[in-house]
Amino acid sequence: MKVLWVSNIIFPEACNDLRMTPPVVGGWMHAGAIALLESNSHLDLAVASLYPGTELKIITNHKIQYYLIPQIKGNQYYNKEWEQFFKQIEEHFKPDIIHIHGSEYPYSLACAKTCNTKNMVVSIQGMVSVYAQYYLGGIPIKEIHKARTFRDIIRKDSLPIQQHKMYRRGEYERQLLRIVKHVIGRTRWDRSNVWAVSPNVTYHFCNETLRPTFYHKKWEYHTCQKHTIFLSQAHY
């Protein structure tokens, strides 16, 4: 069976081939790919990601095949040029299943618009179309403006602007969910919000894998750093 993943990160071995620094996020996805291959010898896995290049690049010298799509003008706005690349990938790899990881990026929508959706599934990693309305945490806009920094002004990236960007990505997300026929999620929250957008979609429950460290280490009181609160990394 041939499975094509659409990912928001470039996996470490592809980064090494491109002489790029591997990402510090999304390690669970790479761990999941390795576990999937180890438990399914008949599986051919390919991963499509955006990269800062100018042409479609194919890497075939690893157990996972990589398709690197030109980022062109970033990943925040929909770019119709992505459609031709996804079509080329589908024709070249001929996947039996297309698995899109994450619903919030416009290139996921490009894949859904272009490729066969009959055997396509999207994994929900959160829903920006819902998060956007809570992005400011109930803090009044005028109070946020008072706390603007030099960085916010120079980069034109204040919290209200970030919220606006999330609303836009949320619209891409809603379009995607109305196209696909299958969605993977983990919680009742996922399921309820997916069905609110697309009532006829088939919802599948599936927990995600974790990074290998979580499976090889065990918490013990006598070795822990006491009186410390551990927080996971946060992107937003």
What are the roles of these predicted feature ranges?
Residues 144-183, 191-192, 196:
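Membrane-proximal helix-turn-helix segments that form the acceptor-binding/catalytic region
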Residues 195, 209-226:
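Acidic anion/phosphate-binding donor-loop and adjacent secondary structure
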Residues 89-105, 111, 121:
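Short N-terminal targeting/anchoring amphipathic segment
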